[in-house]
Amino acid sequence: MIISSSTDYREAARRRLPPFLFHYIDGGAYSEHTMRRNIDDLADLALRQRVLKSVGTVDISTTLFDEELAMPVVLAPVGLTGMYARRGEVQAARAAEKKGIPLTLSTVSVCPIEEVQAASNRPIWFQLYVLRDRGFMKNALERAWAAGIRKLVFTVDMPVPGARYRDAHSGMSGPNASLRRIIQAVMHPTWAIDVGLLGKPHDLGNVSAYRQQKTNLADYVGWLGENFDPSIGWKDLEWIRDFWKGPMIIKGILDPEDAKDAVRFGADGIIVSNHGGRQLDGVLSSARALPAIAAAVKGDLTILADSGIRSGLDVVRMIAQGADGVLIGRAFVYALAAAGQAGVENLLDLFAKEMRVAMTLTGARSIAEISPDSLVRGL
């Protein structure tokens, strides 16, 4: 099929993947209103086209946490990425390195920290959840630092897992889930051979390394779900701030008061995020939450944003709203599932091209020149 956008990669991924995997990455919480608003609210932000602004060259590079990026895009942490392509986290890390940006490795990746970092000459970022098992958290941090990772993304919007109705219907969970997944795999032989057989081991690499025993999909649902800690507060995170010597980025901020708390805590950055609409349905989209947060803490720390970003135009929109950069999750996983490393590389090329076109037509020659004036106000 012809690939010209992330939407095309989504369709290609749908064709290739067993339904339980496609709907796991494609779905959101409850009735998925917030997931849809993430996309729609970004699309509703009208770019302000300008003409004759002498935009001879456009520079989309930027610097985040003293790290130079070819464009203000980071691959977001996505659990089970290694189930979407053979050793998927490794392929994603290589694609990101080739295009001059970092991958953020999920706590619950299939490939462990050491395997992924060894595959890339560029230091990846690492994402960690707040978990009851502090021993696991400390072990993961120590291993990440030893591997050369210096950027920590700390996810705080998951004290309990969100209810994702699609998972029960698709076979990720629900009655006879294991049998349903096997049947689906048999009906998708290309994936079954390439990933199901040749992509083993299919365990949670970082969890297995800590527990010194193999893990599986049941552990992803069981062990992880049992370890989320709703009692956590900012004070409980102080040991991590003291332990981790590199930049620490708090992921899951939707309210200006929480952003101010992150500043007081000493975070180096925040990620304005609703977990892609996968946690609490009915909350603000990231695009709508971002302006008030930027007004509250811009200049005090680095502001990143995710959720709903499907194109380079969306990147420009988020930056115009006050973000310093963005993370993309679903979009790159669709591309990875459809075409592996080459798919992610092509997707990032599409994002870069779309950014350059949008910046040229709004009169911005650099990331620094993207501002609220790049959008039409009052709409």
Curated annotation (Swiss-Prot):
Biological process terms in GO annotation: aerobic respiration; lactate metabolic process
UniProt catalytic activity: (S)-lactate + A = pyruvate + AH2
GO (cellular component) term, any one: plasma membrane
Source domain of life: Bacteria
Enzyme Commission number(s): 1.1.-.-
Principal subcellular localization: membrane
Domain FMN hydroxy acid dehydrogenase: 1-379
Keywords: Cell inner membrane, Cell membrane, Flavoprotein, FMN, Membrane, Oxidoreductase
InterPro entries to which the protein is assigned, alphabetical: Aldolase_TIM, Alpha-hydoxy_acid_DH_FMN, FMN-dep_DH, FMN_HAD, FMN_hydac_DH_AS, LldD
Entry annotated with the keyword Coiled coil: no
Binding residue positions for substrate: 24, 129, 164, 278
Recorded topology in the membrane: Peripheral membrane protein
Family statement: Belongs to the FMN-dependent alpha-hydroxy acid dehydrogenase family.
The protein's name: L-lactate dehydrogenase
